[in-house]
C-alpha cells in the first residue's frame, strides 16, 4: 500500500469519545483511512488484526482500562519496531520519556499540528510497510 493521504492507515487511540471523533473527522477530511480504539486492549487487537498495513499509531497516554498509551506503543513496536507513534497527554511529565520515531503533543493540541507530524513521518518514509522488517 503506497503512502499518501487516501491510502494511509492510522490508528487513533483516544478514550474520550468527543476528542476521538474530532480527530478522526480531521484525518478523514485530509484523506486518511482511520481505525479507532477507545482502550489499550482494543488498540492492540486492531494492530494485530491489521498487520503491517498500519502506518502510524496516534495514542493518548491516559486510556480507560488496564493498558495505557505506553503499553499500546510497546505492543505496536514489538510487532513493528519502525512504526511511528504519536503520543498525546495532558500531563507535562509524560514528555520526559523520549521514544525514537515518535512525536509527543501536550493537550490541548491542534489537529492541524498532529496532521503535520503525520505528514512529516510520511515524507521521511516512516511507517511505510515496505520499509519495515518482516517478523
What are these language model-derived features?
Residues 39, 67-72:
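Acidic catalytic/metal-coordinating carboxylates
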Residues 31-41, 46:
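Short hydrophobic/Thr-rich beta-strand motif most characteristic of the beta2 strand and flanking loop
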Residues 88-89:
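Hydrophobic/aromatic residues positioned on beta-strands within the core alpha/beta folds
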Residues 1-24, 48, 52-53, 82, ...:
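Non-catalytic signal-transmission and effector/linker regions of two-component phosphorelay proteins
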Residues 60-61:
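Active-site residues of response regulator receiver
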Residues 13-14, 37, 57:
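Conserved sequence signature across two-component system core domains
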Residues 70-82:
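Short amphipathic alpha-helix used as the core "switch/output" element in two-component signaling
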